[in-house]
From Swiss-Prot:
Protein name (Swiss-Prot/TrEMBL): UPF0434 protein Tgr7_1374
One of the record's GO cellular component terms: cytosol
PANTHER family, per database record: PROTEIN PREY, MITOCHONDRIAL, ZGC:162634
Family label: Belongs to the UPF0434 family.
Pfam families named in the record: Trm112p
Matches recorded under SUPFAM superfamilies: Trm112p-like
């Protein structure tokens, strides 16, 4: 994920920052509790395509 793109993108629900999860190819929105998929290098920033994060997953990203 290009750092410049990550600096520009925000969560479409909360307008908050996103965290890149390289291992799952997702962009994480802690405030919305959503993970947006990245398909073929392109972030899919649609709420309907995002998956809900579990409490355990949120804890993983708490300090990032």
């Amino acid at each position: 994920m290009d750092k410049r793109l990550l600096d520009i993108l925000v969560c479409p629900v909360t307008k908050g920052p996103l965290i890149y999860d390289k291992s799952h190819e997702e962009l994480i929105s802690r405030s919305a509790r959503l993970a947006y998929p990245i398909r073929d290098g392109i972030p899919v920033m649609l709420e309907d395509e995002a998956r809900q994060l579990t409490d355990e997953e949120l804890d993983k990203w708490k300090d990032k």
